[in-house]
């Protein structure tokens, strides 16, 4: 079966999907929040919710949104500044998601994590239970890295690893990465069409 057809079959049968949204899609080249795009995502998730598909969102963009809110022209390198910018931006990001989902009478729930939260057994179980209950309430859980305390992640990540870990922890049926990047590359720098296994 061709990889495109296999992908479509798996997605059609999925009951719980983790969707990761990259910063480049949330913050435009003009440096402004892409409210139309966020609304488009909310519209699609609302439609899937009508079909009883659970969607858990992993969103990047706190630093980018903070730069917008604070009218800063470029991303600083200083970690303390980045953490403060992320703290401001996270509120803006969640406001944008809230406003988009409110048009569908849906609530959103915010979960801020670090990778170590999923390494600790008790916090891992608490995370899974919280996501499950958020879905039972009919809300959309929105996960972001806790950039205000996650020093390594704020320097190197855009939540791709967090999305993969969350997908595994939640035993979701699929992980969809929405990104401005052309795709995942293997060790030979060739684009991967279908990822069957990740280590």
Regions found by a protein language model. Give the residues of each.
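Nucleotide/pyrophosphate-binding catalytic subdomain
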Residues: 1-199
